[in-house]
Amino acid sequence: MRYSDSYHTTGRWQPRASTEGFPMGVSIEVNGLTKSFGSSRIWEDVTLTIPAGEVSVLLGPSGTGKSVFLKSLIGLLRPERGSIIIDGTDIIECSAKELYEIRTLFGVLFQDGALFGSMNLYDNTAFPLREHTKKKESEIRDIVMEKLALVGLGGDEKKFPGEISGGMRKRAGLARALVLDPQIILCDEPDSGLDPVRTAYLSQLIMDINAQIDATILIVTHNINIARTVPDNMGMLFRKHLVMFGPREVLLTSDEPVVRQFLNGRRIGPIGMSEEKDEATMAEEQALLDAGHHAGGVEEIEGVPPQISATPGMPERKAVARRQARVREMLHTLPKKAQAAILDDLEGTHKYAVHEIGQ
């Protein structure tokens, strides 16, 4: 049963009992990707696989090319080297027709919502259906009303973007991203402009959508609360390279200085106002810290916080079981701290110490 069936039958949107009828999201395989603008290198040799049907987060300081990476994944920008394999097609080498077909797999939530100011929320949400399908207006109405209800905007369809809050605009943008039933959803800094409470609601909404449609979701953000509690997998860009990408426990337990600094929001570390610092600046800041000067941020956060679950009444996230099977297979290749955190999560305990792993 599709969303629209549920809306049409009852007159209001209801959570789906299962994801039957929705294909699982597809994986994205990125190999050796390099992108420059003129003589300025943005990032180089980026290699990762975004697992199908799971939620992943890409972190990084401002200016590291996270949004450029998203635009490359959907073919809006063309890297000069590497490949991006989606559903068996390399979108860098494919024809324009093939790229058009691949783009139908995507839904994109842009950083500012990218709503048309002259259209109300109904017409904004209906726009992709009118542009890319031959559906009747009655069918379009069922889909639009159901997607707006899904993101908590039922009854607001006649409002214009200028009449609603930033959080509502983000949700409207998400509704529009969902109308074509995408298998991949890209979210470009969905928390931008939102307060912590609205960000928490949006995080829950993203997880519920993953439970509903089993789509592959990639979130670009520098919001640490999202990074710690939402994704199945995490990665980080810094100094034109991918620092790491893998199960969330790998990054959250990492001892890499740039990762620890970023996750704790402190001045001490490699990241500076212009992305990176020289050794002299780092030594000076460390001396100030040793002398008792506060380095900003929070106290060092240890451990891996629980991941957000789907709201009760939603379907079970199929991604959870797939991820568990996948990380069990790769467990022996991961750092010891990550292994301990994963075993704790898999067994529902907190009994594993790092020194016990591998014994």
UniProtKB/Swiss-Prot annotation:
Per the record, what is one GO cellular component? Answer: peptidoglycan-based cell wall
Q: Which residues form the ABC transporter domain?
A: 28-264
- Which parts of the sequence carry N6-acetyllysine? 337
Q: Which CDD domains match?
A: ABC_Org_Solvent_Resistant
Q: Which InterPro entries does the annotation name?
A: AAA+_ATPase, ABC_transporter-like_ATP-bd, ABC_transporter-like_CS, P-loop_NTPase
Binding positions (ATP): 60-67
Q: Name one GO biological process term.
A: cholesterol import
Q: What are the recorded GO MF terms, alphabetically? A: ATP binding; ATP hydrolysis activity
Signal peptide boundaries:
none
**Pfam families from the entry?**
ABC_tran
* The entry's keywords: Acetylation, ATP-binding, Nucleotide-binding, Transport
The record's similarity note reads: Belongs to the ABC transporter superfamily.
The role this protein plays is: Not known, could be involved in the transport of ribonucleotides.
PANTHER family hit by this protein = INTERMEMBRANE PHOSPHOLIPID TRANSPORT SYSTEM ATP-BINDING PROTEIN MLAF, PROTEIN TRIGALACTOSYLDIACYLGLYCEROL 3, CHLOROPLASTIC
Name of the molecule in the record: Probable ribonucleotide transport ATP-binding protein mkl
Q: Which organism is it from?
A: Mycobacterium tuberculosis (strain ATCC 25618 / H37Rv)
Quote the gene name from the UniProt entry.
Answer: mkl
